[in-house]
Each structure stands twice: as structure tokens, then as C-alpha cells.
């Protein structure tokens, strides 16, 4: 439908509104699902307040899940099982090594997808589709529309014996339609069923009471003003809405109904104004057509002028090259003729040899003088051969780098719209890419277009992918592993756009991101380590207990390392994870360890203050991670005092200055179980700092150790957690 047709239809609807003659068919546009473009079927209300069919939401999540698995399978094996520890003791490590232990894939399911109605990313949270309300009001309106569309088709009784009679009413409690006789039979007078609520024949049955999706046995009886959604009393008492402002459902119903009625009355009362505005819009449309054609002609004229300049320069450059080529070829031809003459001097040489046979001195001198001059000239030519011209045209290469950059930024006059700037500190890449930018407040843009593309050295041109964004940040998903990507942003205000921002290059991790949390049951020392509730951050407390242990330390004994591991293990495939070590940390170790090695480290923990017990110090001077075995079942690197220590190696320099690097802001660990290799990365630049072989014949776990004061924070996955939606009326 064209714009003029839509405006005419809107004016027609307004006219019917004023006369109170709007029928159900005039609102069909509001009853179409933005995803499947068909009438709504069991519509669900998304967090952005738009409605989408239940099946469409599931299909969107399923398609995202398929693409997520496809990306993961490209960089790892088809099967990459992860083992979750369940036992509170060390027996769980023994258990996973026994034959027959079932390994389950715990690949996280995506819960974020773009709303088909507004294109905003919506996050369904942990409950997913189960946490969404069903839009019963919209469902009822759709059913009325369907009934109006099939008015000639009767709804038959569900309880009649064949052939069934036409139904006359539908019971909302029984969710069935009845003819008069069957309704009397199944709803006898004086019984509880006689009190059931019934309506006209319908196929749309909805519950009489709206239940809370988070607390399925509780009725909805309140309205959260902050989240703009109905809630139950449990949501208010101890749920996600405990600190939110809520009101009673009756009060919210009254307020919203008054607002809606008032707005409808306002629209109906503005019929004449709407008609005049429609006329104005028609004039503006005609003016837009004329101005658009004029702007198009002006743009073509500007480009024709550029083409003329390029053609003129092209002609001049080609003429200069042709002239230089002709001059050089002439010189080469002249020189070639000279050397061709040298070949003809073979006769001269023979003639000179015959002259040498002359015995009469007077005759010889008379002839040899001129002959010697000719021979001498030929000899000099052979001694100093130099081409008469250069064959290379390097001086005639056209430099178009600056012109290419200028032409690439060729755009409309921006009317003062500044170029947005990408915030490099806030932008990052992990499981997804988060791109953040800012724009001067005085040049507030209506929207932005984020462009990105993979940088492929083998291909000259790769097209840019575009995403329209209404905020100043965006999460970009489905990026290929181990690939550099370029990002840039353009601002739009009305129909004017700014030039593109400076490009930001981010390199994706070498493998899919591996999700896990710290294990609070296996080897976790509650006396020295403090784990937060989310189990993604651990701190080491160098307090009174450590001082007491140090007081009794004997010769050959060192303060122990406190180990903590991830709650998920892997047996095959490629995996990547990252963590941040706090700058104040004294000594921290990060890496991987096999289940067998963990048993050795964590089984039968002894008193750190015992003078008989000697434990590995964890230092490079004699630590196990500094051993020179070609392949061992663990690898840990040492980090502390704002330094990153590369472990000792027999193949490289072990001088301290060559092994000590500045501590990165975030450290990435890449485990390739198939190749038996672990690598450590600087996440800021996605640069490999150290790698070595590791024995992956057993289940491998992320392993960490702390000594003294320190802290480790697991890198949080990038998701569309904090979303902003436009305020609805």
C-alpha cells in the first residue's frame, strides 16, 4: 500500500470514528503479527510491550539457537560435551572418570532476539517464553474478527451426537460450545455447573483469572508501574518487583482506561483537523516528488562534473605515459642499431687480421691507422654497456589513496551533524561484540546505522552489514571465531546522515566462549576464599589464619596455594574463556588441569600449619607448572603484582626480563582438546602471550589458585541485558 492510500484509509477510519461506525475489519492492520504477517495466534506480550504469536517467538529462538550451534560447530567438533560437577565431595571427580558416566552438553540457549515490531533486542531471561504474558484481550479481538470474516460458517455443538447441531452458546468454564439441548443436559439447574459463565458461540476460550507466569499458582492482582506489567503479591514481596512501585489492578485498570478513552475522544474530536492535515500531507507529497527529482538532477550533475574531471585527468595521464613510452622505444631502437652494427664488425675483424699479415711497414702503417680507430670504438662500446632508457614505469603510478578516502566519505551536506565517535574503552568482543559510541548532545540524532564487516585479506571487497539502532550501543552476535571485524557508525537526523565514524577493529576469540562458574563444593577453602553469590568472582583473604600458619612455618615449607576450579569440564573440542585478575593481587595462577591432577591437588587437604607437610610453593623456581615435560595434564601461568610471568621453557630464554610482561586487563585462555594445546591471550588486543602442549586425555577443568590477597573475576558474557524501550501511551 502506498503512502497516499494509507493516508486516505486513515482519513476514512477517522470519519467512521466520528460517526461511531468503525467495524472490526477496519482494524485488521492491528491484528497482524509482525513476524508471520498473519492474524495473531496465541499472542504473547514481549518486554517492549509489542505482541508476537507464541509459535513465532519459539521459531525466532529456534533459528537463533541453530545459528549459534552452526557457528560453534565451524570452529570445534560436532560433539563437545561439558561435564557439570554435582557431588559435594572429591568423589565427583572420581565418578566422571568411571566408564558409563553420562556426559551432557550444556550449551547455553539464546534468550535474546530482535523484536519483529520495533527491532529492539529483547531479553526473555531465564524463564524464556514461560515468563511472557498471553495477550488475551488481543486474542479476543482477533477471534471477533475471524467470526466476522466467517459469519456464514456456524460453530457446531461439541457434545451432540453426529450430525451435530449449531451451537447457541459457549461455556468459558468448560471451554466448549453447546446447542440449547446439550447446554441444559450438561449444566443442570441447581448444580455448580449452572453457575458457569457462558457467552455467544466462540472458539476462543481464555481463563477467567489471569495467573502469574513466574508464580503459576498465584493470581495477578497488582500492576508494576516501573515494569508496566501485571504482577502477583509474591512478585512484590520477594520477587523481581520487591523494590518497585506497584498499584492495585483496579486502580491501574481505571487509570489506563480513562487515558485510552480520553485519547480516543480526542482523536474523534479532531476530524476536521485531520482532514486539513491530510490535505497538507498531499501537498507535501507532491512537493517532495518535485524536490526529490530536482535533488536527483543536481546530484547527477555533480557526479557528471566529477566524471569529466576524471576523464580529463585520465586522458592527460595516458598521453604522458604514451609519450614516455615512445621516447624510450626510440632510444632503444637507436641503441639496438648500434649494437647490430657491432655484429656486422665481424668482417672488420677479419679484414684487420688480413692487414696484420702485411710485411711492408709503410703500407701497414698507412692502412692500420684508420682501422685501429674503428676497432677501438667497437671495443669501448662493449666495455661500457648501459641501456639507453629505463623499462620501468614506477614514476607513472597514479596515487589515488587520498582521493579514494575522500570519495569514500562522499555524502550529503550534513547541515552540522557531527560524526559519532566509537568509544574504544567501552566497546569489546567476547561471545558477542558490544559497540558503544557517543554523539554531541547539541547534535542529537534520531537514529544510527551500525555497519560491520569481516576483514578478509584474501578478498578485495566485502560488503558491509547494516543495523539500524535507536540508542548509542548495540550487541552484534553471530560473528565468526578467530576473525577481525571492522565497525563504524553513521548518524541520521531526519533524512540527513553524517559521514561514517572512524573504524574500530576488533578480533573475535579463537574459539566459542565456554560458560562456567566457580565450583563452591570441590576444593573450595571457605577459610581463605570468599565467593560471591553469582559464583563468578572469588577473593583471597590474607587474614589472621594465614598469619598463624606462617608463625609455625618450618624450613622447606611454604604458604599453600588455595585452589578453586570451574564447575564444568570438557573432553574434546575448542573452548575459550576469560577472566580479570585484580591489580592488587599478590599471586594468582590461571590455566587448566585434568581431573586426575585435581584429585592429586585437592584430595585429603592437610593443615597448612603442619611442619611435616610440604606443599608446592607455586613459584616458578620449582613449581610443577615450570616443568619441561613436552605434555603434562595441566598448565598454569603466574600473575601477580601487576605482572604476567611466562613459565620457564628449555627452548627459550629464562632471563627474568624476557619472561615478565605487564599484566593485561583481561586474560583469555584457549583450550584445544583435539590438538592438546592451551594458549593464553591478552584480551585487549587478542594477542597470544604464551602457549604449550597439554595432555587432554582426561576431562579438563578451568583451574585457578590464589595466595595472599587477590581476586579473580570471570568475564561476563555480552548480552542485551539492559534495554531501553520507547514509552508507550
From Swiss-Prot:
InterPro entries the UniProt entry points to: B30.2/SPRY, B30.2/SPRY_sf, ConA-like_dom_sf, COS_domain, E3_ligase_FN3/SPRY, FN3_dom, FN3_sf, Ig-like_fold
Tissue: Expressed in testis. Strongly expressed in the neural tube region in 14.5 dpc embryos.
Domain spans labelled COS: 356-413
ZnF (B box-type) intervals: 154-192, 207-249
Coiled coil region boundaries: 271-302
Gene Ontology MF: a single term: zinc ion binding
Keyword match Metal-binding: yes
Subcellular compartments: Cytoplasm; Cytoplasmic vesicle, Secretory vesicle, Acrosome; Cytoplasm, Cytoskeleton
Residue ranges of the region described as Disordered: 606-626
Compositionally biased region (Basic and acidic residues): 613-622
EC code(s) of this entry: 2.3.2.27
Chemical reaction(s) catalysed: S-ubiquitinyl-[E2 ubiquitin-conjugating enzyme]-L-cysteine + [acceptor protein]-L-lysine = [E2 ubiquitin-conjugating enzyme]-L-cysteine + N(6)-ubiquitinyl-[acceptor protein]-L-lysine
Family annotation (SUPFAM superfamilies): B-box zinc-binding domain (SSF57845), Concanavalin A-like lectins/glucanases (SSF49899), Fibronectin type III (SSF49265), RING/U-box (SSF57850)
Gene3D superfamilies: 1.20.5.170, 2.60.120.920, 4.10.830.40, Classic Zinc Finger, Immunoglobulins, Zinc/RING finger domain, C3HC4 (zinc finger)
Cross-referenced Pfam families: COS, zf-B_box, zf-RING_UBOX
Domain called Fibronectin type-III: residue spans: 416-511
GO cellular component, one term: cytosol
Gene Ontology biological process terms in this record: acrosome reaction; microtubule bundle formation; mitotic cytokinesis; regulation of cell cycle; regulation of microtubule cytoskeleton organization; spindle organization
Span of domain B30.2/SPRY: 509-723
Positions of RING-type zinc fingers: 33-84
The entry's keywords: Coiled coil, Cytoplasm, Cytoplasmic vesicle, Cytoskeleton, Metal-binding, Repeat, Transferase, Ubl conjugation pathway, Zinc, Zinc-finger
Function: E3 ubiquitin-protein ligase which mediates ubiquitination and subsequent proteasomal degradation of target proteins. Involved in chromosome segregation and cell cycle regulation. May play a role in the acrosome reaction and fertilization.
Family membership noted in the UniProt record: Belongs to the TRIM/RBCC family.
Record protein name field: E3 ubiquitin-protein ligase Trim36
Upper classification of the organism: Eukaryota, Metazoa, Chordata, Craniata, Vertebrata
Amino acid at each position: 500500500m502506498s503512502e497516499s492510500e494509507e493516508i486516505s484509509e486513515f482519513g476514512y477510519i477517522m470519519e467512521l470514528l466520528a460517526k461511531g461506525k468503525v467495524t472490526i475489519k477496519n482494524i485488521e492492520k492491528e491484528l497482524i503479527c509482525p513476524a508471520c504477517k498473519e492474524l495473531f495466534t496465541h499472542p504473547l506480550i514481549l518486554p517492549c510491550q509489542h505482541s508476537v504469536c507464541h509459535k513465532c517467538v519459539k521459531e525466532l529462538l529456534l533459528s537463533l539457537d541453530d545459528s549459534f550451534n552452526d557457528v560453534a560447530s565451524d570452529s570445534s567438533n560436532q560433539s563437545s560435551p561439558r561435564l557439570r560437577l554435582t557431588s559435594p565431595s572429591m568423589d565427583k571427580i572420581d565418578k566422571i572418570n568411571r566408564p558409563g558416566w553420562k556426559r551432557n552438553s550444556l550449551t547455553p540457549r539464546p534468550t535474546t532476539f530482535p523484536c519483529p515490531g520495533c527491532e529492539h533486542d529483547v531479553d526473555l531471561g531465564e524463564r524464556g517464553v514461560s515468563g511472557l504474558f498471553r495477550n488475551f484481550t488481543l486474542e479476543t479481538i482477533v477471534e471477533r474478527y475471524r467470526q466476522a470474516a466467517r459469519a456464514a460458517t456456524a460453530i457446531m455443538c461439541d457434545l451432540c451426537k453426529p450430525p451435530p447441531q449449531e451451537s447457541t452458546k459457549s461455556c468459558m468454564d468448560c471451554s466448549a460450545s453447546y446447542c440449547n439441548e446439550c447446554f441444559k443436559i450438561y449444566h443442570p439447574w441447581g448444580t455448580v455447573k449452572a453457575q458457569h459463565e457462558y457467552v455467544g458461540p466462540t472458539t476462543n476460550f481464555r481463563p477467567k483469572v489471569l495467573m502469574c507466569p513466574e508464580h503459576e499458582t498465584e493470581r495477578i492482582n497488582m500492576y508494576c508501574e516501573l515494569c508496566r506489567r501485571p504482577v502477583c503479591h509474591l512478585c512484590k514481596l520477594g520477587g523481581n518487583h520487591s523494590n518497585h512501585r506497584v498499584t492495585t489492578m483496579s486502580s491501574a485498570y481505571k487509570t489506563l482506561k480513562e487515558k485510552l478513552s480520553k485519547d480516543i475522544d480526542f482523536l474523534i474530536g479532531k476530524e476536521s483537523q485531520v482532514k486539513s492535515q491530510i490535505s497538507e500531507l498531499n501537498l507535501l507529497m507532491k512537493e517532495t516528488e518535485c524536490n526529490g527529482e530536482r535533488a536527483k538532477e543536481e546530484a547527477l550533475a555533480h557526479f557528471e562534473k566529477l566524471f569529466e574531471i576524471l576523464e580529463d585527468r585520465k586522458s592527460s595521464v595516458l598521453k604522458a605515459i604514451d609519450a614516455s613510452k615512445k621516447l624510450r622505444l626510440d632510444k632503444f631502437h637507436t641503441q639496438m642499431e648500434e649494437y647490430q652494427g657491432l655484429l656486422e664488425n665481424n668482417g672488420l675483424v677479419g679484414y684487420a687480421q688480413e692487414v696484420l699479415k702485411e710485411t711492408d711497414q709503410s703500407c701497414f702503417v698507412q692502412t692500420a691507422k684508420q682501422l685501429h680507430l674503428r676497432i677501438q670504438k667497437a671495443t669501448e662500446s662493449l666495455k661500457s654497456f648501459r641501456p639507453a632508457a629505463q623499462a620501468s614505469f614506477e614514476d607513472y603510478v597514479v596515487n589515488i589513496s587520498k582521493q579514494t578516502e575522500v570519495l569514500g566519505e562522499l555524502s550529503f551536506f550534513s547541515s552540522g551533524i557531527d560524526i559519532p565517535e566509537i568509544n574504544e574503552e567501552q566497546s569489546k568482543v567476547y561471545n558477542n561484540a558490544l559497540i558503544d559510541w557517543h554523539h554531541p548532545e547539541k547534535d542529537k540524532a534520531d537514529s544510527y546505522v551500525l555497519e560491520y564487516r569481516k576483514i578478509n585479506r584474501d578478498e578485495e571487497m566485502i560488503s558491509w552489514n547494516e543495523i539500524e539502532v535507536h540508542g548509542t550501543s548495540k550487541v552484534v552476535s553471530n560473528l565468526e571465531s578467530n576473525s577481525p571485524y571492522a565497525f563504524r557508525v553513521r548518524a541520521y537526523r531526519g533524512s540527513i546522515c553524517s559521514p561514517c565514524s572512524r573504524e574500530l577493529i576488533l578480533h573475535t576469540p579463537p574459539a566459542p566462549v565456554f560458560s562456567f562458574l566457580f565450583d563452591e563444593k570441590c576444593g573450595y577453602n571457605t577459610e581463605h576464599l570468599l565467593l560471591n553469590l553469582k559464583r563468578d568472582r572469588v577473593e583471597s583473604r590474607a587474614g589472621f589464619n594465614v598469619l598463624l600458619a606462617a608463625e609455625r612455618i618450618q624450613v622447606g615449607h611454604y604458604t599453600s596455594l588455595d585452589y578453586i576450579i570451574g564447575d564444568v569440564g570438557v573432553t574434546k573440542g575448542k573452548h575459550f574463556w576469560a577472566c580479570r585478575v585484580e591489580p592488587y593481587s599478590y599471586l594468582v595462577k590461571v590455566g587448566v588441569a585434568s581431573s586426575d591432577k585435581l584429585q592429586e591437588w585437592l584430595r585429603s587437604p592437610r593443615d597448612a600449619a603442619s611442619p611435616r607437610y610440604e606443599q608446592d610453593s607455586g613459584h616458578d623456581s620449582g613449581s610443577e607448572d615450570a616443568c619441561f615435560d613436552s605434555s603434562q595434564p595441566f598448565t598454569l601461568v603466574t600473575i601477580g603484582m601487576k605482572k604476567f610471568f611466562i613459565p620457564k621453557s628449555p627452548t627459550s630464554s629464562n632471563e627474568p626480563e624476557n619472561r615478565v610482561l605487564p599484566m593485561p586487563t583481561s586474560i583469555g585462555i584457549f583450550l584445544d582438546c583435539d590438538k592438546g594445546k592451551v594458549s593464553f591471550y591478552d584480551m585487549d588486543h587478542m594477542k597470544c602471550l604464551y602457549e604449550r602442549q597439554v595432555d587432554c586425555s582426561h576431562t579438563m577443568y578451568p583451574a585457578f589458585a590464589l595466595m595472599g590477597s587477590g581476586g579473580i573475576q570471570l568475564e561476563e558474557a555480552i548480552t542485551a541485558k539492559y534495554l531501553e524501550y520507547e514509552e508507550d501511551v
